[in-house]
């Protein structure tokens, strides 16, 4: 059985990942800024590399309709964690495998790195 603290952390970071999928957060640069480290970068499922400053425009990261499933947390240290999960894009029907590295800084967890990889049919990550 997993440590209760690890279970709580898994729930907390999953909630943060889900926040990053919400229109309210994705379209609000101030909200995004609080969830991403200053040196955040992403390898998008499109193949494009994104940096935090790319997402800080008036519209933020833009709106999406996605469903998260299969969330897993892998502790790297007391202040770093890797998350893996699957996303279903409700608009296109496409699926991607996702991974993120989260760092705890100044008492809060922020995303440092994110990657999306196009996936085939549903399967276990």
Task: List where the protein language model places each region.
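A beta-strand edge to alpha-helix "cap/lid" segment located at domain peripheries
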Residues: 2-34, 39-125
């Amino acid at each position: 059985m997993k440590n209760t603290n690890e279970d709580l952390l898994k729930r907390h970071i999953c909630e943060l990942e889900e926040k990053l999928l919400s229109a309210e957060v994705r379209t609000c640069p101030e909200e995004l800024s609080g969830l991403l480290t200053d040196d955040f970068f992403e390898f998008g499922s499109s193949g494009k590399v994104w940096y935090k400053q790319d997402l800080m425009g008036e519209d933020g990261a833009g709106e999406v309709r996605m469903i998260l499933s299969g969330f897993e947390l892998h502790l790297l240290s007391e202040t770093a964690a890797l998350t893996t999960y699957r996303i279903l894009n409700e608009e296109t029907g496409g699926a991607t495998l996702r991974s993120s590295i989260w760092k705890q800084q100044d008492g809060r967890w922020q995303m440092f790195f994110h990657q999306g990889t196009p996936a085939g049919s549903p399967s276990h990550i």
